[in-house]
Design a protein with these regions (language model features):
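Aromatic (phenylalanine/tyrosine) cluster motif
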Residues: 3, 11-13, 22
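Class I Rossmann-like S-adenosyl-L-methionine
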Residues: 17-345
Length: 345
């Protein structure tokens, strides 16, 4: 699932409102994605009650946050592996009386200032204590990943520059994460084995991790907070209200959609398209403070990934016509400011 975080209308709206964009922006996008998945599953499983489905939504969001912590511990595991390798080197040199010429790469990695902060972070330690041995079970993978990282041009350039300032240490970790962990089929496979709830979350959660790396400073100590699961209580409420409004107003919202299907019978529409439009309309009619462009663009992004190739364009046109009619009838005061570039893609 790929979101254009920096260019999304949500980003610009939250920035103008002086809200903590590093948390709210990502959480809202993740919430919308989860609501789409869970609403789709709700209709596929007709025996499921609304209360059970709501609990599943809450659990699914909790699992996404666990994935965030889980991925941060990959970096800590790599650091610990580097420390073990360097300890072997030191013991060997002590035994043989030899000495390493120049810089010892394993020591440099193990002494990385940002990774030291992460290893000592209280929140991450608490998470790891409750899940002992999670990456130790994947020792072969950690070894292979570490080898790829230390043999890479990114790491070699970092070593060659011999700039081991805090900023350089943090930046090399960010680059290495983006290059070797963000796009890693082996990690994706392991994640899927650990939890089916993590299947579609990784690309969004990777952005959480990258933002977290940038939030640390040289003065960050063990109490440095990680990103909270919800930036504000309104985000938690947003998830529950959006899901419930979508289901409870389902018949009404589907009738609205049905009225605007011109050349297609309603029954011939892709089911995912109907679900996405139903949720988008629920958001438009339930949350007055969310700008129309934000709602449009977030669900069009989801449609590009989760539905048919032409769905985004079709949904865009349908929603645009529906909202104009709703505004004309006085059911919403929202007006679309202007079509964004992604609407016409």
């Amino acid at each position: 699932m790929a979101f254009s975080l920096g260019c999304s209308p949500a980003f610009h709206y939250l920035r103008t409102q002086n809200i903590g964009i590093f948390t709210i922006m990502i959480n809202r996008e993740l919430i919308r994605l989860k609501v789409v998945q869970l609403v789709y599953a709700y209709y596929q499983n007709e025996g499921k009650t609304l209360e059970v489905a709501e609990k599943e939504l809450t659990f699914s969001l909790q699992k996404a946050y666990e994935l965030y912590e889980y991925l941060l511990t990959v970096l800590v595991s790599l650091k610990k592996h580097a420390g073990r390798k360097d300890a072997v080197r030191v013991a060997r040199e002590k035994r043989t009386g030899s000495a390493t010429r120049g810089i010892a790469p394993d020591k440099v990695f193990a002494d990385n200032k940002f990774l030291c902060q992460l290893e000592n972070n209280k929140e991450l330690i608490d998470y790891s204590e409750n899940r002992k041995g999670m990456w130790e079970e994947e020792n072969a993978f950690i070894k292979k990943l570490y080898s790829r990282i230390t043999e890479s041009d990114i790491f070699q350039l970092y070593i060659d520059k011999e700039d081991f300032s805090y900023e350089a240490d943090r930046e090399v970790v960010r680059k290495l994460y983006k290059t070797f962990i963000c796009d890693n089929d082996e990690i994706d496979a392991m994640i899927e084995e650990h939890s089916l709830y993590w299947n579609d979350d990784k690309q969004v959660v990777d952005s959480f991790v990258l933002k977290t790396i940038k939030r640390f400073t040289e003065s960050s100590d063990a109490e440095q907070p990680l990103l909270p699961m919800y930036a504000v209580d309104e985000d938690r409420e947003f998830a529950n209200r959006l899901f419930r409004a979508t289901i409870e107003r389902g018949p009404e919202l589907r009738e609205i959609i049905r009225a605007f299907t011109k050349n297609w019978e309603f029954s011939r529409l892709a089911f995912m398209d109907v679900v996405i439009m139903q949720i988008a309309l629920a958001e438009i009619l339930t949350f007055d403070a969310i700008p129309l462009n934000v709602t449009f663009n977030e669900y069009l992004d989801i449609a590009k990934v989760y539905s048919t190739p032409r769905s985004s364009s079709y949904i865009n046109g349908m929603l645009d016509n529906i909202v104009k009619k709703l505004a004309k009838d006085g059911r919403t005061a929202k007006v679309r400011v202007q079509p964004s570039k992604k609407d016409g893609e």
